[in-house]
Amino acid sequence: MAYSPSLNDIKSILNKYTSKDYELKCENRYDGKLELWLKGVFEEIVKTPGTRYVTHKQLDEKLKNFVTKTEFKEFQTVVMESFAVQNQNIDAQGEQIKELQVEQKAQGKTLQLILEALQGINKRLDNLESK
């Protein structure tokens, strides 16, 4: 036997999926089935949350704002070229830093030698003063 919803079931379904802007009429038929009438504007009766139809003209207008594949490829090459230039700059700066570190080490060794020489002179002066 097929499922036959009651009038309350039908009303609860209509309340769930439709707005309140309609007139509902329901009668029992001679064969025991329900006859149901809805009177109202279809778009106002049926709720369509999130459902929106777009015409081709509207779609074309929207698509004008999107980037084409060739434009995207051009943009991508420009970005990749700028990344390559930045990478070269970073490599050059890294080499400069290495050179400066080597120079700094050499200066540190020179300063150490100067310090040792000054300490040697200081010891000699102390020896001369003590005599």
UniProtKB/Swiss-Prot annotation:
Q: Which family does it belong to?
A: Belongs to the UPF0134 family.
Give the protein name, as stated in the record. UPF0134 protein MPN_010
Give a Pfam family name. Answer: DUF16
Domain of life per record: Bacteria
